[in-house]
Amino acid sequence: MKSLFLSEKIYVLILAGGTGSRMGSKIPKQFLELNGEPILIHSLKRFQNWGKQKRIVLVSHFESIPKIESICASYLENEDRIVQGGENRHSSMLCGLSVLDFKDEDIILVHDAARPFVLADELDSLCEKVRSDGIATLASRTSETVLEELNGKTVSFLDREHVWFMKTPQGIRGDVLKELLTFSVDSIPTDLCSWALTFGKTSSIVESNPLNLKITRKEDLDLAEVFSSLFQKISSDI
């Protein structure tokens, strides 16, 4: 691997293409309010307040772009972009990547807009892993017993010491991403790490804070209201 990349740039793709269908809402989930502000704004603020120089690209459905321009304008810098996404998460990620002029040493982070509780020190640790290992993701452990089922019946129990729940951001170094982009896929990957694994590239894990949930359903939004004050506390304690 190359030595430390002192001239690297950091790019952040925030995928904001949710429709709100699983939420049972006509309003896309990224626009639903959490403590008086859209969820998207909470997620955007996590990166704007990070303290690192970075370029942010927001990716969304065409019909949502005017709304994003309206609510996010004051949080975006001159080089930040809002771009139209694709038909699914992977194609939307590719749309965001297509506007980046990244180099081999650069770091690209991909984050779900519906995850508003990521910590700055986690972002630092993730970037360190990406520098050294090429691909990395935030993930969390479980204290629960994990089982596998088939047709509603228990089949086996998994060793929870080796079970992690995938989170975002996920990150990739520019040289590794360039290689991935040369391959064609037979099926649609669910995220950056599954895309990489399709071609034999494993991802390193950085442990995430326990509040880093993805707001997908109404009960998630209810939890997020509770988590918000806890998140502010752990953010200030670090």
Swiss-Prot record:
The record marks 22, 29 as: Transition state stabilizer. GO terms for cellular component: cytosol. Belongs to the IspD/TarI cytidylyltransferase family. IspD subfamily. It catalyses: 2-C-methyl-D-erythritol 4-phosphate + CTP + H(+) = 4-CDP-2-C-methyl-D-erythritol + diphosphate. The keyword Ion transport does not apply. The record marks 160, 214 as: Positions MEP for the nucleophilic attack. Catalyzes the formation of 4-diphosphocytidyl-2-C-methyl-D-erythritol from CTP and 2-C-methyl-D-erythritol 4-phosphate (MEP). GO terms for molecular function: 2-C-methyl-D-erythritol 4-phosphate cytidylyltransferase activity; cytidylyltransferase activity. It holds the Pfam family IspD. InterPro entries: IspD, IspD/TarI, ISPD_synthase_CS, Nucleotide-diphossugar_trans. SUPFAM superfamilies: Nucleotide-diphospho-sugar transferases (SSF53448). The keyword Nucleotidyltransferase applies. This is 2-C-methyl-D-erythritol 4-phosphate cytidylyltransferase. CDD domains: CDP-ME_synthetase (cd02516). Its EC number is 2.7.7.60. Signal peptide: none annotated. It comes from Leptospira interrogans serogroup Icterohaemorrhagiae serovar Lai (strain 56601). Pathway: Isoprenoid biosynthesis; isopentenyl diphosphate biosynthesis via DXP pathway; isopentenyl diphosphate from 1-deoxy-D-xylulose 5-phosphate: step 2/6. Keywords: Isoprene biosynthesis, Nucleotidyltransferase, Transferase.
